[in-house]
Curated annotation (Swiss-Prot):
GO molecular function: magnesium ion binding; phosphopyruvate hydratase activity
Localization terms from the record: Cytoplasm; Secreted; Cell surface
Required cofactor(s): Mg(2+)
UniProt gene name: eno
Name of the protein in its database record: Enolase
Length: 434
């Protein structure tokens, strides 16, 4: 009854108006699962391949009809008849069928859509919430959200080199409280920016994209917004950034165009470290470029005992690359993006490896998103503890937050918000200093 009987795919649009793949998997029992695949703007060079048509006369070359055809052709032929409850078998079938290291023959967007839709169909067949199907009886941890409230870099047309400035409501008692604290800070920040004559348009992930003097001014605005919203910076709401340093790493230097600086990797480490002394900055993602492993080792040596250092572009959710990083002493946390690796099974393997090595895990969206909220269930199902899914506006971002509210309600008093554990893990109880 849980046997896959049909697979369907279609081309839909993501939050940037670009095509992406949506897949539906139907079972013999009549249960179905649907999943839509996100897309990134700043991407790691070793990510699994997102297949695009390349026809400039249609969606400016970004159509995904080839990926859709692959789902409804080769992939459907291979997985119809398989048991949806055997996720590993389904995903291994996809991997064998593709036969490449980077999913370049069938496309990671085609494969991931099928993989996630299969999991949804299986959870529906069993009558279980997706988070419980993914994680079992011990799925109970509500993640701390890393809320992107100021955008720069590749995500916004302004003079900020750092791609994301985020807030983390670590002092909340529940996820519901954390969401409220974040929303109140977001709206306070909007008012502060508007009062000073800054544009309050938003970037791809819903954060504001003002032209500011420098990065310190961005931090100061956020600190003021936290305080005027009635919260204590550091103790109740901490700060995080995604530098996305690969985007401005050129010829061995970190070119901070907005600040007129060209830094070596050691100077970049020092520059980032200075922010941690001035502000309650507890998490830095992609502080160095993906190819700069020497810089990453230095960053980890100098800051890894006190703050979270998240590897995104350097690891691309790949268990083999993460294993290298663990051996090399690089970072202490990994960003998990489903479409970087292309199947649910490989994603779960990466998360398990990270936990075994005492690396924290941050489940993440992409800048090109849909209304699909699979990552919310994944974050709770795997007790990941953190989720990065954008700002407090745009329905594609709020869909994930709202699903977490539903999950927390479903868990009732058995749910645990990760904020206090995040504080104790890195020792962030003290209020940060400006």
């Amino acid at each position: 009854m849980s046997t896959i009987v049909s697979v369907w795919a279609r081309e839909i649009l993501d939050s940037r108006g670009n095509p992406t793949v949506e897949v539906e998997v139907s079972l013999e029992s009549g249960h179905t699962g649907r999943a839509a695949v996100p897309s990134g703007a700043s991407t790691g060079s070793r990510e699994a391949l997102e297949m695009r048509d390349g026809d400039k006369g249609r969606y400016k070359g970004k159509g995904v009809e080839k990926a859709v055809d692959n789902v409804m052709g080769e992939i459907a032929e291979a997985i119809v008849g398989l048991d949806s409850l055997r996720q590993v078998q389904v995903d291994n079938t996809l991997l064998d069928l593709d036969g490449t290291d980077n999913k370049s023959r069938l496309g990671a967007n085609a494969m991931l859509g099928v993989s996630l839709a299969t999991a949804r169909a299986a959870s529906s067949f069993l009558g279980l919430p997706l988070y419980q199907y993914l994680g079992g009886v011990n799925a109970k941890v509500l993640p701390v959200p890393l809320m992107n409230i100021i955008n720069g870099g590749a995500h916004a047309p302004n003079n900020l080199d750092i791609q994301e400035f985020m807030i983390m409501p670590i002092g909340a008692a529940t996820f519901r409280d954390a969401l409220r604290m974040g929303a109140e800070t977001f709206h306070t920040l909007k008012a502060l920016l508007a009062a000073d004559g800054h544009v309050t348009s938003v970037g791809d992930e819903g954060g504001f994209a003002p032209n500011l003097k420098n990065h310190d001014e961005a931090f100061r605005y956020i600190m003021k917004a936290i305080e005027e919203a009635g919260y204590i910076p550091g103790a109740e709401i901490a700060l995080a950034i995604d530098a996305a340093a690969s985007e401005f790493h050129k010829d061995g230097k970190y070119v901070l165009a907005g600040e007129g600086k060209n830094l070596s990797n050691s100077e970049m480490v020092e520059w980032l470290g200075e922010f941690t002394t001035r502000y309650p900055l507890i998490s830095i993602e992609d502080g160095l470029a993906e190819a700069d492993w020497d810089g990453w080792r230095e960053l980890t040596y100098k800051l890894g005992d006190t703050i979270q250092l998240v590897g995104d572009d350097i690891f691309v959710t790949n268990p083999d690359i993460l294993a290298e990083g663990i051996d090399e002493g690089v970072a202490n946390s990994i960003l998990i993006k489903l479409n970087q690796i292309g199947t649910l099974t490989e994603t779960l393997d990466t998360i398990e490896m990270a936990k075994q090595a005492a690396y924290t895990t941050v489940i993440s969206h992409r800048s090109g998103e849909t209304e699909d909220h699979f990552i919310s269930d994944l974050a709770v199902g795997l007790n990941a503890g953190q989720i990065k899914t954008g700002s407090l506006c745009r329905s594609d971002r709020l869909a994930k937050y709202n699903q977490l509210l539903r999950i927390e309600e479903d868990l009732d008093d058995t749910g645990i918000y990760f904020g206090p554990m995040m504080s104790s893990h890195f020792g962030f109880e003290e209020e940060g200093e400006e």
